[in-house]
Amino acid sequence: MTAADRKLLESFGRALAAQKLRLVYQPKVSLKDGRLTRVEALVRWDDPELGPVSPSRFVPLAEQHGLIDPLTEWGLRTTLKQWRTWREQGLETRLAFNISAVSLQRLDFPDLVERMCRAMGVPTDRLVLELTEGATQPLVRLMDTLTRFRIKGMGLAIDDFGTGYSSLLQLRQLPFTEVKIDRCFVKDLPSAHDSRLIVRTIVDLAHGLGLVATAEGIETIEQLRCVRELGCDVVQGYLVAPPLDPGDLIGWDREFKKRWPALLSDESLELWGDVEADTLRQR
């Protein structure tokens, strides 16, 4: 381990123990009617000395040095508590929560998640657990764990689909409920013919297996229109909303419902041009 990584790990451990991390929530909406279908919980760490630290830096260290389980439990508990607050305020939605392949090696993990849902008063069918495609490789070991999640009523999404090496047979064998199409296939839409073909193929595959097809990284109206034309069910990205602080979600939902009818109309480019620019500047 480098000195920089050691310092980062020590700082992260202190931040986790002191609950100095925070969660933001990025909405996902249905392409059928613009309705909020779920929100994805995303961890953020703003260190006083290091500044904002990307999860791509601290999550791998947490996985390698025994901190991923406490991070997961803190994040899940915080997310479930926030769901209950939203519900008390009149907002109904589902939750999407990312889990590490390391956590999936725990035999008691499905039971732990179920107990946490029960303790927080959150029905298990309100929770969708997201796994990156790379995490699905040890299929024989994961099959039992993932099946137990499904038996308990939780949804399972395969994230960043198309960027790893999982076979179509493996996708069929695993009990997923949702496929998330990676943003690398979305960014060149609608002009790139090969990207259109790949997205169409993934959507057809997902629907053929009875899965929901979600497009990530939607940043322009043209991309939104294209994935809708290609048959996607759900979209997520900065055109819809950046990751939001929990207190901002209800206000966003109210305003987005007003904007949705015009989003796919001929006037939408004029109406939404400033929104696109503003949200992208927040990245």
Question: Where are the regions a protein language model picked out?
Answer:
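EAL-family c-di-GMP phosphodiesterase catalytic domain
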Residues: M1, A15, L31-R35, P48, ...
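Structural preference for long, well-ordered alpha-helical segments in enzyme cores
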Residues: L8, A41, L61-A62, G75-W83, ...
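A short, well-structured catalytic beta-strand-centered motif of the EAL phosphodiesterase domain
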Residues: R22-P60, T79, E114, V179, ...
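Catalytic core of bacterial c-di-GMP phosphodiesterases, primarily the EAL and HD-GYP domains
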Residues: L31-E40, H65-R141, G217
